[in-house]
Design a protein with these regions (language model features):
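N-terminal glycine-rich phosphate-binding loop and ensuing alpha1 helix
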Residues: 3-53
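Conserved acidic residues
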Residues: 7, 48, 69, 105, ...
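Short phosphate-binding loop-to-helix
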Residues: 58-108, 123-127
Length: 238
């Protein structure tokens, strides 16, 4: 809890994966990928319950071994590669409310593909949201340079470079550009009532919580897995 408010952490983990077979339970530094997010959630000083939403009995068993609650097996219609994550989150919240009479003031989404995000990151994000009276949601963001619009170009039909607005390309000094950020995907936090009503974490009352770029690495294919494992070994993750 935080300031008397209850917090739930939800880890969505379906069985299917096109980029990396059995992605959510692929070994990473001696643990299944999903274990890193479960354990980070359990170590958070603010999260009261960590649950895993999955359509797989195997993933459910592994999640339980690492301490997560698995109160249901996700319905097949919510486990396709086109299912919006928000539908999975809302389903979990409604199940707990209707079947177990459990309600939480804040909801934290922890994608299992972001194993570099730890409990300190989670707690910083939760506290930032709770401490900001004017906000009802928060998402993790990272500063980007290579993808800054100032450095992006288009191509004409004849492969000549064009500015994004079809104008002449003008050289830009890195020191002159404004910072821009991307949604880095490792953490989403929201007031639960607002989340259910809006069905999104991103709206005009959403804060950005800045994370270093290396924290934003996601495991979606074998190349990602190799890079993330190298970082973990270098930084001596627990």
């Amino acid at each position: 809890m935080i300031n008397g408010k209850s917090v739930i952490g939800i880890v969505p983990a379906r069985a299917g994966s096109k980029g990396l077979p059995r992605k959510n339970i692929v070994p990473l530094c001696g643990k299944p990928l999903i274990a890193w997010s479960i354990e980070a959630g359990l170590r958070s000083q603010y999260i009261d319950l960590v649950i895993v939403s999955t359509d797989s009995n195997k993933i459910a068993g592994i999640a339980a071994e690492y301490g997560a609650s698995v109160p249901f097996i996700r319905p097949a219609e919510l486990a396709t590669d086109k299912t919006p994550t928000i539908d999975v989150v809302i389903h979990a919240l409604e199940y707990l409310n209707n079947q177990r009479k459990q309600r939480f003031d804040y909801t934290v989404l922890l994608e299992p593909t972001s194993p570099l995000r730890d409990e300190a990151d989670i707690d910083r994000a939760i506290k930032q949201l709770v401490d900001n009276i004017g906000a009802s949601s928060l998402v993790g963001i990272s500063r980007t340079e290579a993808q800054n619009p100032a450095f992006l170009v288009g191509l004409s039909e004849n492969n000549f470079l064009l500015g994004l607005d079809q104008s002449e390309i003008k050289p830009v000094r890195r020191q002159e550009i404004k910072d821009v950020y991307f949604l880095e995907g490792s953490i989403y936090v929201s007031d639960t009532k607002t989340l259910i009503a809006r069905r999104t974490f991103c709206h005009q009352e959403t804060l950005g919580c800045i994370f270093p770029k290396w924290k934003s690495l996601e495991v979606d294919d074998i190349d990602d897995l190799i890079m993330v494992e190298a970082l973990m070994l270098h930084k001596k993750f627990p």
